[in-house]
């Protein structure tokens, strides 16, 4: 079957080539005759002879006075196809054929580049119907999610938006100027997505001035290494809105954060000069008391960019790269302001300096303190960047760091009312049968528990009704037939779940709070 098809293709190819050669020969002959007639100097000789040869409606030379009107008749359509008045001709059709003996056909086409129509030949493969001029690189998938291509290269969003030709294939849209295709490198809006697109630009991308894209075009990011900036942007957390109601208790801490963080963002005209908001807030207290959630709530209420930094974010194996990461962190925070830089377990990064520590750690701490003071900010404006640190061991922090954290807020263990509120929040939507008296009894029994300890207790209690059911019944039982959780289940779970913070740790933290802590003062 394939041999027959190949044979027919070859025969058809030869036949088309012969026809084209005949047409080309006729064109040459007609052109020669036309040139000979043009040399005739007799009055009306050119048109009368021309119409005699090509037009069936022409009259003999010896006819009446209708010769003048006949000589002004238009050239026939057949003559227009075979010859050209301006002595220009098209190249033979077979010169455009492919060399692999493909079955092809030729037809006059119109240029699709937005210019005037041109009578040009366009070779088309009959087997697959794809024009050779339309062969291009594979079209990207319909659903494109890479915003970097849309911003820096100006690619088209989807294949479905492209027009179709008469063969049912997609056509490339008209080419636009480089100024319309290329978007400016510097983002118009200081968003994390736009900044990530800028850092992911390849070296082959060029701007309107044929220069490689550089972060130096952004004043806040001048001199920042692209790879380090991309590493810092990975620490940005984009979470759902966290409200103050999600945090149980901590009335004094909420009041202090309200006047130092939330109100200055709402009324910046009132908080300037001596009322200017502080640059650093230290949250210290036992583990599991919600220090991270408080920082997220502050960033959410201020609509700020939230950087979650740990020791691994600023420590590098390369010599001298730690301080560069610190500088890059504050540069990105200033560009994306308002920003909140939250450093969990800050004592692991900014501990007290000593002569035995490594030189790289000392330089990194020094750079952090310089950036936190804002010495490198030369624009004269107040940066809306807040540094929040959380630690369980505030005694390990360097004194110079403590000076920069002007607000040091103690986050204690939840009291009786806070534990009751937290238990109600955790039991919301669960099958629990607890009265107010039962909740009070649970709060009394959980004295010294942190928020994470109470969460672990509730999870352990929720498994008690399931353990009473055999494995065979548990596979097929209806969830609505499982009995609710009662006070007895909490009492049995208290045997397995114990508080994680010792009383000695609580006393040390309370003593440090009396010496260095900040107490809330109501407005």
UniProtKB/Swiss-Prot annotation:
Cytoplasmic side, ranges: 1-41, 59-523
Pfam annotation, one family: Vps4_C
GO MF term list: ATP binding; ATP hydrolysis activity; isomerase activity
Biased composition (Low complexity): 57-71, 171-184, 193-210
Gene Ontology cellular component list: cytoplasm; membrane; microtubule
Biological process (GO), any one: microtubule cytoskeleton organization
Intramembrane spans: 42-58
Keyword Transmembrane helix: no
Protein name stated in the entry: Spastin
Annotated organism of origin: Naegleria gruberi (Amoeba)
Lineage per the UniProt record: Eukaryota, Discoba, Heterolobosea, Tetramitia, Eutetramitia
């Amino acid at each position: 079957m394939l041999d027959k098809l190949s044979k027919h293709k070859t025969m058809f190819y030869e036949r088309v080539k012969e026809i084209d050669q005949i047409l080309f020969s006729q064109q040459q002959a007609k052109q020669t005759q036309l040139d000979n007639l043009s040399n005739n100097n007799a009055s009306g000789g050119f048109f009368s002879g021309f119409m005699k040869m090509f037009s069936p409606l022409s009259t003999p030379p010896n006819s009446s006075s209708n010769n003048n009107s006949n000589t002004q008749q238009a050239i026939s359509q057949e003559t227009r196809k075979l010859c050209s008045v301006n002595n220009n001709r098209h190249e033979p059709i077979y010169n455009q054929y492919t060399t692999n003996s493909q079955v092809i056909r030729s037809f006059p086409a119109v240029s699709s580049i937005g210019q005037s129509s041109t009578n040009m030949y366009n070779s088309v493969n009959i087997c697959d119907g794809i024009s050779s001029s339309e062969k291009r690189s594979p079209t990207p998938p319909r659903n494109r999610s890479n915003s970097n291509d849309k911003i820096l290269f100006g690619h088209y969003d989807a294949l479905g938006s492209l027009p179709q030709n008469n063969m049912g294939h997609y056509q490339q849209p008209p080419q636009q100027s480089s100024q319309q295709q290329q978007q400016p490198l510097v983002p118009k809006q200081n968003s994390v997505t736009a900044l990530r697109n800028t850092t992911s630009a390849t070296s082959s991308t060029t701007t309107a001035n044929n220069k490689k894209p550089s972060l130096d075009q952004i004043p806040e990011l001048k001199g920042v290494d692209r790879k380090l900036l991309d590493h810092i942007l990975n620490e940005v957390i984009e979470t759902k809105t966290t409200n103050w109601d999600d945090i149980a208790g901590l009335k004094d801490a909420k009041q202090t954060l309200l006047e130092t963080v939330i109100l200055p963002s709402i009324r910046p005209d009132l908080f300037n000069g001596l009322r200017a908001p502080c640059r650093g807030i230290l949250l210290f207290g036992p583990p599991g008391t919600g220090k991270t959630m408080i920082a997220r709530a502050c960033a959410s209420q201020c609509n700020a960019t939230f950087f979650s930094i740990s020791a691994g974010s600023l420590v590098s194996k390369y010599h001298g790269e730690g301080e560069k990461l610190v500088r890059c962190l504050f540069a990105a925070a200033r560009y994306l302001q308002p920003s909140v830089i939250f450093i969990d377990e800050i004592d692991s990064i900014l501990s007290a300096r000593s002569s035995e520590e490594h030189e790289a750690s000392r330089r990194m701490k020094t750079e952090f303190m310089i950036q936190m003071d804002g010495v490198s900010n030369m624009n004269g404006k107040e940066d809306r960047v807040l540094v929040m640190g959380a630690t369980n061991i505030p005694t390990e922090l360097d004194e110079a760091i403590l000076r920069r954290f002007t607000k040091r807020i103690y986050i204690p263990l939840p009291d009786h009312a806070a534990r009751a509120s937290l238990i109600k929040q955790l039991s919301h939507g669960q099958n629990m049968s607890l009265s107010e008296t039962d909740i009070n009894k649970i709060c009394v029994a959980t004295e010294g528990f942190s928020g994470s300890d109470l969460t672990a207790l509730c999870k352990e209690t929720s498994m008690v009704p399931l353990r009473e059911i055999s494995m065979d019944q548990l596979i097929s039982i209806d969830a609505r037939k499982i009995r609710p959780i009662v006070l007895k289940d909490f009492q049995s779970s208290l045997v397995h779940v114990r508080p994680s913070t010792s009383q000695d740790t609580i006393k040390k933290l309370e003593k440090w709070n009396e010496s260095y802590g900040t107490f809330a003062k109501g407005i």
